[in-house]
Amino acid sequence: MLGGQIRSPKDFGEGDFRSFAPRFSAENFPKNLELVDKITAIAKKKDCTPSQLTLAWLMAQGDDIIPIPGTTNLQRLEENIGAMKIKLSNEEEQEIRQACENAEVKGARYPEAFAKACFADTPPL
């Protein structure tokens, strides 16, 4: 979603897991897109992509935070590396944090049928 290619549930490819997740349903998707739009607006002010802004924000949180971006091609890798050049002011960090804290995520992360598999006990070694 931060990459800008996904703006509605119709943008998911056939068989994409997200098309089954309640968080990405036609009802919940627009509500969850509000945070993406806020991040995008801040990124435009910084002349960077929303993905770069998010990575820069994570890297600014301290040495104990290590972002692991999903990188599917060379263009995304180069974009992610560009995040290292972005410096955020304390005010910008706070603006991003506030946007995240104020966001009301709608819909469960996984379909209800998957819930039992998500919270299973690990077998003893």
Can you say where each PLM-predicted feature lies in the sequence?
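Hydrophobic faces of well-ordered beta-strands that scaffold small-molecule active sites
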Residues: 67-70
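Terminal-tail/helix-coil boundary detector
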Residues: 14-45, 60, 64, 78-125
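Short, flexible micro-motifs
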Residues: 7, 73, 110
